[in-house]
Amino acid sequence: MNLSVKLPGLNLKNPIMPASGCFGFGKEYSEYYDLSLLGGVMMKAATQFERLGNPTPRVAETSAGMLNAIGLQNPGVQQIIDHEVPRLAKYDTSIIANIAGSSIEEYEFVAASFNQTTDVDALELNISCPNVKEGGIQFGTDPFMAKKVTEVVKKASNKPVYVKLSPNVHNIVEMAKAVEEAGADGLSMINTLTGMKIHLPSRKPLIANKTGGLSGPAIKPVAIRMIYEVRQQVSIPIIGMGGITSAEDVLEYLIAGADAVAVGTANFQNPFVCVDIINELPEVLEQYGFNSIEDVIEKRGITV
Ligand SMILES: Cc1cc2nc3c(=O)[nH]c(=O)nc-3n(C[C@H](O)[C@H](O)[C@H](O)COP(=O)(O)O)c2cc1C
């Protein structure tokens, strides 16, 4: 069965990609399976300089998902270009760089840096990380700022730009429209929902950062609703994510309005989850009367 999907800058052999921050730069996972099986890889965030991230503890399990406040730990954009991208480029898969910053200038610098390499196929612009003190969140919650940073990155980069939206907003459609107007080639949605967990013996927040981003199956219905709403109003492609653990979840995302998907937290529970989903997808599509990914995308106008 044909699982391929064509998106701006991306010829995906299948619509499954590990989500940013849940796959590092693929090194550890490459010991489990051949990364060429994946539609693409969404790399961990890149900032201008190396970041050590937030103090620990910075991850916690909750009764319905996972909280994290990693704080964009990464070795800095030049290290990523010099060492991580060449290692990933050996695989026959698309590479998407996730870029972050605490100022417009930093986003511009990081976006322009990736022009050095043709091995990166597209940028995912993270305007939505809730766990960095300086800036970050203001780009993801204010349509004016989101538009501005998208415009600057589009101008600085020679690659298609997918803007990753935060669910921590009142009106997701307004955010999506703002970045579409600014020239975004696609959307990536959603990032984590801000949450908190209390450590009972100390009566303090369990995560050192106090709050963290909630991910995993708990956020899937929120993501599906937001993608559905945005799909009605915006015409650029959407890479959907949030709590995907199975091929059925992928189909739900595609029908709601996504064009491809990313799998995040589930990789921590089952390192083979992306390959398992890719293997199961043809049977699940067939079961629900579809004969390709394109077929689902074409027919969803009727179903939704
Ligand atoms: C540990 C962890 C680190 C993450 N780091 C990033 C990141 O660096 N950049 C980014 O855009 N999103 C990051 N995310 C968000 C994920 O890419 C994804 O949008 C979110 O977790 C929802 O998908 P999921 O429920 O499948 O995990 C991170 C998520 C987790 C759990």
UniProtKB/Swiss-Prot annotation:
It catalyses: (S)-dihydroorotate + NAD(+) = orotate + NADH + H(+). Its EC number is 1.3.1.14. The keyword Cytoplasm applies. This is Dihydroorotate dehydrogenase B (NAD(+)), catalytic subunit. Pathway: Pyrimidine metabolism; UMP biosynthesis via de novo pathway; orotate from (S)-dihydroorotate (NAD(+) route): step 1/1. GO terms for biological process: 'de novo' pyrimidine nucleobase biosynthetic process; 'de novo' UMP biosynthetic process. Pfam families: DHO_dh. The active site is at C129. Binds 1 FMN per subunit. The lineage of its organism: Bacteria, Bacillati, Bacillota, Bacilli, Bacillales.
